[in-house]
Amino acid sequence: MISFKVAPLADLEQHWQQAAEWSFEAWRHDFPSDTVQTYLDQYALARSKPEQLLEVFAAVTDNDQLLGVATLVHDDELPDALEPGPWLAAVFVTSDARKFGVGSALVNQVVDRARDLDYTRLFLYTEHAHSWYETKGWIKIRDTIFLGLHHTVMQLDLSGQTPSALQQ
């Protein structure tokens, strides 16, 4: 078992570089023009422009080791997206921390925050993890091709269940 907390990445600047490197590696096939600096700039924007919907959350251990990140964003850059947003985006958990509830905690934090902001729906798109999200109450709404790769677009209704009702 890993003991960890989820907090805004804006408050954990010591982890920005690692989070940016992970994000760049994880999604460079989807966003080939992005760089590590792209993510660092997003983290700075999230901290400096609270009026924009761009919030990044990080899971960190009690001894301040970064385990993963997840983002709540108005637009997740999916070309031709019909969905209005907001989006759960850029969920990443380091391989050593998987199967310990880190991903669930990060997703639940984003869901909580979207609900706090009075959104009634939340969207995501995923290349590989649609089955995992379905176990958390997300429903598939369509398939799409993005840069030649199949992705599943999903939605979570925020008006009914509370995050604590979502399965860990």
Describe the predicted segments one by one:
Residues 134-144:
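Conserved acetyl-CoA-binding loop of GNAT-fold acetyltransferases
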Residues 56-58, 64-75, 87, 92:
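Conserved beta-strand in the GNAT
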Residues 125-129, 142-168:
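C-terminal "cap" of GNAT-fold acetyltransferases
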Residues 97, 101-109:
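Conserved acetyl-CoA pyrophosphate-binding loop and the N-cap/start of the following alpha-helix
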Residues 76-84:
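A short, polar/charged loop-to-alpha-helix boundary motif
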Residues 23, 28-61, 77:
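Active-site rim helix/loop that mediates acceptor-substrate recognition in acyltransferases
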Residues 1-18, 159-168:
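Conserved N-terminal entry element of GNAT/NAT acetyltransferase domains
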Residues 114-126:
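Conserved GNAT acetyl-CoA-binding A-motif
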